[in-house]
Each structure stands twice: as structure tokens, then as C-alpha cells.
């Protein structure tokens, strides 16, 4: 049978997170390109999933971005405040649960209603969203961490890096 129990899933997720924590300093070392741009990154309110967001953070840092990781279960106003405080032009929003799509919509709306909205590039990703969702909500969609990096580079006016350089 292909059944999985919640404790097994939780232990697996913890093991992956521990591996990421261990390997991250080796992936994002002193030799990476240094960009002046900051990316604000977080998982929307109501969602506590972190592995995908953490992988995106590592990829962005390895491409030279400074990343402000807001964590999980982040309310819309915290995304807005962090973008302002860090003078960021790129905000990456993650969700894993279909039940948190409403939270993503609220977050995008809060960012678009802010006076700085014309300066902000909003990138969305995660299981419950797609390109159509992003277009309908005036955002860009990244299917994976590499695409997130390429969209962030594009927002800075930099050509995307070939996959082997990420």
C-alpha cells in the first residue's frame, strides 16, 4: 500500500530541512555574484510549508540576490512592510495548499494597492497557482526555483543565467 502517515511525512520534511540547512553554506559561498537587489520572500498566511520556499531562497542567494525570508504564515501587510523597509523591487510569494490561494490573492492585492506597486515585481509560485492565476492577478508565475531566479534577474534587467550556472 502507498499510504503515508503524518508523522512520517513530518519526519521526512524535517530531514530535508536539516539537509538544506547543512548544505546551504556550501551552495551559497563567498564566490557568488553579488547583486544589489533584495528579494522579499515568504509563504502566505495560513500556509506553513517551507521546503520549496527555502529552496527558492538558496537559489536566489546563489545567483547573488540578498534575500529577506519572512518565513511561513505571513500576513499581507508584512510583505508590504518588508518590501518597503528593504527597498525591494522583487517580492516572491509561495503557497502549497489550495486553501491558501485566498491568502495569496489578498497579499497580491495589498501589494498592488500600495503606492510603490508600480516599482514591484511580484512572483508567485507553488502547487495551487499557475500562469493563468498569475496573469489574472497582475503577477508573474514561476514553476520552480530556477524560473524564480530567471524572473528576478529579468526584473533587474539581467539576462537569465544558463541552467548550468545556477
Which residues are covered by each model-predicted region?
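Domain-level signal for soluble alpha/beta catalytic cores
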Residues: 1-90, 95-166
Amino acid at each position: 500500500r502507498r499510504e503515508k502517515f503524518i508523522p512520517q511525512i513530518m519526519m521526512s520534511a524535517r530531514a530535508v530541512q536539516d539537509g538544506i540547512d547543512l548544505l546551504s553554506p556550501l551552495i551559497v559561498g563567498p564566490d557568488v555574484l553579488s547583486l544589489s537587489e533584495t528579494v522579499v520572500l515568504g509563504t502566505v498566511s495560513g500556509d506553513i510549508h517551507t521546503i520549496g520556499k527555502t529552496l527558492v531562497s538558496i537559489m536566489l542567494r546563489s545567483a547573488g540576490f540578498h534575500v529577506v525570508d519572512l518565513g511561513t504564515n505571513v500576513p499581507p501587510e508584512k510583505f508590504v512592510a518588508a518590501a518597503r523597509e528593504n527597498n525591494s523591487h522583487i517580492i516572491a510569494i509561495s503557497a502549497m495548499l489550495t486553501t491558501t490561494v485566498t491568502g495569496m490573492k489578498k497579499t497580491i492585492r495589498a501589494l498592488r494597492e500600495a503606492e510603490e506597486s508600480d516599482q514591484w515585481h511580484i512572483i508567485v509560485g507553488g502547487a495551487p497557482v499557475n500562469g493563468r492565476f498569475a496573469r489574472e492577478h497582475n503577477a508573474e508565475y514561476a514553476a520552480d526555483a530556477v524560473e524564480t531566479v530567471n524572473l528576478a534577474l529579468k526584473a533587474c534587467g539581467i539576462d537569465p543565467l544558463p541552467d548550468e550556472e545556477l
